[in-house]
Swiss-Prot record:
Name of the protein this chain belongs to: Neurexophilin-3
GO molecular function, one term: signaling receptor binding
Matches recorded under InterPro entries: Nxph, NXPH/NXPE
Function text: May be signaling molecules that resemble neuropeptides. Ligand for alpha-neurexins.
Tissues/organs with expression: Highest level in brain.
Listed transmembrane segments: none
Record region (II): 23-75
Subcellular location: Secreted
Disordered as annotated region, ranges: 27-58
Lineage, opening ranks: Eukaryota, Metazoa, Chordata, Craniata, Vertebrata
Length: 252
């Protein structure tokens, strides 16, 4: 299978890249359930004969409406007549599951050489597409890379300071940059090694938004930070079981 790199990298100098790797599982679709409403209406002037309204089906938009209706068994009990068909349990709600988006997250790293803050959000639109938003604010020297990876991605350091994706677990995803902005300059502040002095350091701000399709089942954020005095690798994954009716069983 072809090697895919979809990792976006925030460099203090202002370069941005995006690569996504994933597994070929997609979020399960949902269908609108249907139910039949059967009503019986007695004919008052003809004894021992009853007429029935023809059954009709309509989509159920919200299963909570069923709580406002009396069960068919109780309705027939009040009228003193038996029901025509056995009662069936109501189908589950047809609400669209948005299991891919899991809200805001941030990473704040402070070292002698760099002060870094990264914020982001992943939004599932419920139609097979999702948006990725990132912002980064850095003062000093260092590199930060942020990737969208599957849960099977190992957390480890790389000598080349890049994130490589195994070919067997890769798949091509459609992503395009919607918006990007980079600002660079110099900022003066108290020196970390000597607070009595004032130092001038590089300052960079950047933000970007991507629109992607064909997401994998569970997405994790993978952060790798490298500087002259510190390095960090971290993977953050959402609680998939909280968003889905079916449990998630990781593989790989």
């Amino acid at each position: 299978m072809q090697l895919t790199r979809c990792c976006f990298v925030f460099l203090v100098q202002g370069s941005l890249y995006l690569v996504i790797c994933g597994q070929d599982d997609g979020p399960p679709g949902s269908e609108d359930p249907e139910r039949d409403d059967h009503e019986g209406q007695p004919r008052p002037r003809v004894p021992r004969k009853r007429g029935h309204i023809s059954p009709k089906s309509r989509p159920m938009a919200n299963s909570t409406l069923l709580g406002l209706l009396a069960p068919p068994g109780e309705a027939w009990g009040i009228l003193g007549q038996p029901p025509n068909r056995p009662n069936h349990s109501p189908p589950p709600s047809a609400k669209v599951k948005k299991i891919f988006g899991w809200g805001d997250f941030y990473s704040n790293i402070k070292t002698v050489a760099l002060n870094l803050l990264v914020t982001g959000k992943i939004v599932d639109h419920g139609n097979g597409t999702f948006s990725v938003h990132f912002q980064h604010n850095a003062t000093g020297q260092g590199n930060i890379s942020i990737s969208l990876v599957p849960p099977s991605k190992a957390v480890e350091f790389h000598q080349e300071q890049q994130i490589f994706i195994e070919a067997k677990a890769s798949k091509i995803f459609n992503c395009r940059m919607e918006w990007e902005k980079v600002e660079r300059g110099r900022r003066t502040s108290l020196c970390t090694h000597d607070p009595a002095k004032i130092c001038s350091r590089d300052h960079a701000q950047s933000s970007a938004t991507w629109s992607c399709s064909q997401p994998f089942k569970v997405v994790c954020v993978y952060i790798a930070f490298y500087s002259t005095d510190y390095r960090l690798v971290q993977k953050v994954c959402p609680d998939y079981n909280y968003h889905s009716d079916t449990p998630y069983y990781p593989s790989g």
